[in-house]
Amino acid sequence: SAGIESPDYVWNADSAEKTAILKLKGDASSGREAYQGCQGCHKSNGAGIPDGTYPQLAGQHASVLIKQISDIRAGLRENPKMFPFAGKHVVTPQEIADLAVYLQNMKIPRDNGKGPGTHLARGKELYLKDCQICHGDNGEGNADKFYPVVAGQHYPYMLREIRDIRKGKRRNA
């Protein structure tokens, strides 16, 4: 497959690792244990940090989490903060599957994602025009297509990721 800098790059192309991890049966109990190493940044409830430095992971589709970690490991998503934690020498494919199931089953803290609320009508208009087709009517995403849940995600995180996608900095989305 073409590298991320290539115009032929496909954001959701299958990778051998992603495909292999998706075939594994994740165990939420083992995922809970493995998540201990993630809590420093993403917090015990998976809510991340309100300033958007660390995203909410609670309630995210397991397939999306697996894709993102696989992309980081393959160098298809730049995320220097995650490199030390997502490396192949740190976390196994089975642990990724376990973590993904555990996080998917966590309750989404919906109040997380609220921005200032100053332009709600315009935000809704933009969402319906540009985002709804993939992320759904209520930000629920689509696990089968690797479209993430955006409902409840931190407002500053969303702004940063949207800007990075538009600038071509984040090309795996």
Predicted regions and their residues:
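Electrostatic cytochrome c docking/interface patches
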Residues: G3-Y35, P50-T53, Q104-L126
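The canonical Cys-X-X-Cys-His
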Residues: G31, Q36-S44, L99, G123, ...
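Disulfide-stabilized extracellular ectodomain repeats and their linkers
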Residues: C38, Y54, A62, L128-C131, ...
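Axial heme c-ligation environment in periplasmic c-type cytochrome domains
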Residues: I49-Q56, I72-M106, D111-G117, D144-V149, ...
